[in-house]
Amino acid sequence: SFIWLQRRQALQINGMNRELETANEFLATLSMKISRYLSPQIYKSIFSGQRDVVIQTERKKLTIFFSDIKDFTATTERLQPEQITRLLNEYFTEMSAIALKHGGTIDKFVGDAMLIFFGDPESRGEAEDAAARLRLALDMQHRVAELNVKWRNEGIEHPFRVRMGVNTGYCNVGNFGSADRMDYTIIGAEANLAARLQSIAEAGHVVVSYETYALVRRMIEA
């Protein structure tokens, strides 16, 4: 009868709606898991449709930050693998929170090193990007000092000594790689200079290039 057909259709529609809800929940969960492998700014620009996942780069003026842990190899030799893994993950967790607070784009972790940049995909202007970068570095050094006190109280005799380098200049930024596997990263001489500045910094200090210094001179002198 007609009423029976209506009920049958209603049941079918309800079943389809439940399947769609389940599928949407699965996709939302999967999306959140994938987001852990991307900087939040990049993730949002991709999933909002603002950015295509294609091999494409553009030239932009960025402020680039490199850091690493001085004598990290020697530190790993003094500690058990489980200890160094715990400390490194805690360190990266704290540093990442500071980077995101200041609006930095976390490019990658390489061993004990971090690469972060300002100016893409969001920018507040050259001077403000550079100032945010400097505030980030100072906040990180302060937090590392606090972590070292905590770790010494836990019996870690020689915790992390972090050195940092900051530079401002033009880089190519975007998706590099192949159609099957790509990274959103930066490439260029200015990024290499930031890495070199980090390598000459003393532990617990930040070395800033003249280009960055010129943008934040008033902040430093104040």
Pin down the residues of each PLM region:
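Regulatory cytosolic signal-relay segments
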Residues: 3-59, 220-221
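Catalytic NTP-binding/metal-coordinating core of nucleotidyl cyclase/transferase enzymes
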Residues: 28-30, 52-135
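Helical mechanochemical/support elements of P-loop NTPase systems and associated helical scaffolds
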Residues: 42, 84, 91, 110, ...
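Alpha-helical scaffold within the catalytic cores of cyclic-nucleotide enzymes
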Residues: 89-104, 120-164, 189-191, 195-198
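Acidic/histidine metal-binding catalytic segments
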Residues: 110-111, 152-163, 205-212
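Catalytic strand-loop-helix junctions within cyclic-nucleotide turnover domains
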Residues: 117-128, 164-182, 203-205
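Short, surface-exposed loop/helix-turn segments at secondary-structure junctions
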Residues: 154-156, 176-188
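Cytosolic regulatory/linker segments at or just downstream of nucleotide-handling modules
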Residues: 171, 200-222
